[in-house]
Amino acid sequence: MEKLVIIGAGGHAKVALDIAILMHNWNEIVFLDDYKTGEIFGYPIIGKINDSHIYKYSHDFFVAIGDNQIRSEIQNHLINEDFSIISLLHPSATISIFSKIERGSIVMAGSIINPNVTIGQGTIINTNSSVDHDCNIGDFVHISPGVAIGGTSSIGSYTWIGLGSNIINNITIGSDCIIGAGSVAVSDINSNVTAVGVPCTPIEKS
């Protein structure tokens, strides 16, 4: 399709718009958002998220909402209703031809995706991040700007890796985790854990 609906109208949506324009795949780009009206950089907000069905057969869709859980709920609903969900890949990103990126994901400027990497649905690979060879990144993950992930590592679904964190090779981080900004993971992290620091250590629950 030559038309694109971006769901969401916040900061993440602004970046998605920029990438979509640079990809030159769509001659019309519009937004749906439940809280904002008007336009973003001259591109109109034309309705609310529930209006998606109006554009189902004429537009591609991208869900540009930073919250992993909300993004997954909206995207999974659209997938179940057979909407056309696309990924956005910045032209300056270096993406191996031997990697796999599932629909609804975004790879931002300056990022590197090396061979035999799998990135799940609805995942954010933010600015200047790197994912080395043989890594598996789950669904609806957020890899923040400047994160470096060593080879043969695994990041579970719904996990958020904070700004500038480093994960050495052969590390498994479970699902639904939060890794604090600037952390260095040198050992595995179980699911449903918040961990911070150098080395990255789970925070004790009070």
Residue ranges of model-derived segments:
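Glycine-rich adenosine-cofactor-binding loop
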Residues: 2-18
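Short alpha-helical
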Residues: 11-12, 69-70, 100
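Conserved Rossmann-like nucleotide-cofactor binding loop
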Residues: 12, 37, 201
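NAD(P)-binding Rossmann-fold cofactor-contacting core
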Residues: 23-40
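Phosphate-bearing ligand-interacting subdomains
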Residues: 36-94
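Structural signal for interior beta-strand "rungs" in well-ordered beta-sheet cores
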Residues: 87-203
